[in-house]
Amino acid sequence: MSSANPPFTLRVVEQIDSTNAELLRLPLEQAPPGSALLALRQSQGRGRSDRRWESAPGGMYLSVMLRPSCPQGLALLGARALLDLLDSWGMQGTLRWPNDVMIAGRKLGGVLPVARYQGNSLERAVLGVGVNVLQTQADFPAELRGHVTSLVQQSPRSQWDVVETAQRYLRALET
């Protein structure tokens, strides 16, 4: 991550419409670069092409305000941090272009970068990351079952914590 980004400050909320939308709504003074917002549940999570992102309880719904030197590389940067984190846990993840992170052929999560410009100048960039952490197949809508997975389903670890997962992701993003 570029040295233009300070260490991250994580704020956790129980529920919100969308973590990306919230960071984009806030004045920059209230959400400077390095601000991170984690929701334990989202009511209007979005993915690529404005598709609805299932935000079932037990997922990590995280957005981070950044000041990147190259906003076009944010999706790859966010996915790479998640892949590195999975590797540190002994899990083999892959990137399904352009923004999905997969394990064993099933979608674990995704990244959604949003850049806002004022004229030709980058005003702000938000990186949204959604990861299925605690969900079982029964927690997902019937049409997604068999196509998605979660950390708890893919790991021999018996204990997972969404906030700790977000903190570890932010550390991976810093490196």
Question: Can you say where each PLM-predicted feature lies in the sequence?
Answer:
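N-terminal lobe of the biotin/lipoate ligase/transferase fold
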Residues: 1-88, 160
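Long, positively charged amphipathic alpha-helical accessory segments at protein N-termini or as interdomain linkers
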Residues: 2-6, 69-93, 103-175
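Conserved active-site carboxylates
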Residues: 100
